[in-house]
């Protein structure tokens, strides 16, 4: 899957594996003809990239959003969002990944939401990955 963003292109692909159906993906950032792999957040070791989006602040600075979850079926309460700058640097974390309130689990996107507010960004419309 390819997501076109201003000045860049994001690639989301399945990582080949020995098993028949791989559920691991890789995200690459392409700028100026060069590709670099975006490092997944360490806390997402048990999850994989499932969506891509583009965001731009009021000054025109571009950012990229990668959504993490599970493939191929998704999961009940896992939609984490991570913000990257144009150099491919991860700008937020989700530590711990899950929070529990009133015996209900939900994804911890607090730092992501704080970064959006700090940078004056709106959560973008995300393109979901369809394996």
Region spans (language model):
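Short, surface-exposed coil-to-beta transition loops
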Residues: 24, 47-51, 63-64, 75-80
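A short, structured loop/turn motif at beta-sheet edges
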Residues: 53-62, 85-91
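Acidic, small-residue rich beta-repeat scaffolds with periodic aromatic anchors
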Residues: 1-9, 15-19, 71-131
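Structural signature of eukaryotic scaffold interfaces centered on beta-propeller domains
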Residues: 1-7, 52-59
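Repeat-based blade/solenoid architectures
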Residues: 42-50, 104
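Surface-exposed loop/turn elements that mediate protein-protein interactions on large endomembrane-trafficking
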Residues: 26-43, 80-96
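Acidic/hydrophobic-patterned starts of short beta strands in beta-sheet-rich repeat architectures
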Residues: 11, 57-69
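Beta-strand-enriched, solvent-exposed domains that form extended recognition/catalytic surfaces
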Residues: 18-21, 33
């Amino acid at each position: 899957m390819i997501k076109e963003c201003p000045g860049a292109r994001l690639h989301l692909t399945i990582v080949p594996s020995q098993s028949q159906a791989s559920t691991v993906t890789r995200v690459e950032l392409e700028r100026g003809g060069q590709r670099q792999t975006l490092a997944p957040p360490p806390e997402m070791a048990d999850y994989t990239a499932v969506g891509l989006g583009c965001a731009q602040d009021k000054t025109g600075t571009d950012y990229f959003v990668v959504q993490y979850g599970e493939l191929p079926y998704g999961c009940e309460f896992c939609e984490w969002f991570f913000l990257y700058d144009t150099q491919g640097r991860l700008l937020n974390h989700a530590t711990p990944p899950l929070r529990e309130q009133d015996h209900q689990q939900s994804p911890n996107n607090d730092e992501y939401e704080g970064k959006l507010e700090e940078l004056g960004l709106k959560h973008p419309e995300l393109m979901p990955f369809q394996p």
